[in-house]
Every structure is written in structure tokens, then in C-alpha cells.
Amino acid sequence: MFFASDNQGPVPEAVLEALCVANQGYAASYGADAITLDVVSKIQTLFEAPDAAVYLAATGTAANTLALACLCPPWATIYCSPVAHIQEDECNAPEFFTGGAKLNLVGSYDKLTPDALEQALLGT
């Protein structure tokens, strides 16, 4: 299977077959169907968090940016490296979903470092 992108190529045959099986019959909507409830239960079990709220997203960009939106209020800033995935691959989706902004910080090897973050937070 090829997972470089969730929206640039065809799905593997096994995925398409599973979609066809899931498409049989009728099911409740908005996450109340048996398949979604089963997935939620399995994720809660996997993470040993039986009370965890689980939300499924159609793409990696949606999952990443919605998660950031839960953490980042509109007046806040997302600190990241200039080569971070959210900077390089998510385009303006983080700003769109959070209403905030990204601030690129350069550390050693373009990795976000505690020193770079401290300087940004202190305005130095």
C-alpha cells in the first residue's frame, strides 16, 4: 500500500472492497452506525481510554488541523519549524481552521528547540 498522500492516488483494492462491504444495507447517520461505533470502541481500547471522545476525519490535513483548532484559540500562535509538516504540507489549513497564525522558528537543523521557543515567548 502507498500512503504518501491520502488524496493523490487510488485506494488499495482491499480498501475499496471494504468500502463496498460497508455500503451494503442501511445504517444510522452521523457516527451512530455499527461500523463507526466499532472503530471508536477499538480506538478507545487501543489507547486504554474507554471514555475518550473519538472523531474520525476524511483526510490527514483535516485531522491535523482540526486537532490544532481544538488546542489553539483564534488569538493564539502555532509555533513550528519552517520545515514542519504543518508548514510544508498543510498549506493554509491550520490558519483557516484555527483562525490563528503560524510563527516559524528556526533552531538547530531547522528543528524547534526549547531555546528558540523561549526566545519567541519572551519576545527576545
Predicted features along the sequence, with ranges:
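Conserved core of the PLP fold type I
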Residues: D51-C72, A101, L105-D110
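Conserved PLP-anchoring active-site segment centered on the Schiff-base-forming lysine
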Residues: C70-E88
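Short polar catalytic/cofactor-binding loops
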Residues: N7-V11
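Conserved N-terminal alpha-helix of the aminotransferase class I/II PLP-enzyme fold
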Residues: P12-T59, P82-D89, A93
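Extreme N-terminal starter segment of soluble prokaryotic enzymes
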Residues: M1-F2
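Domain-start "cap" segments at the beginnings of catalytic or binding domains
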Residues: A69, H85, C91-A93, T98-A101
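PLP-dependent aminotransferase-class I/II
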Residues: T98-T124
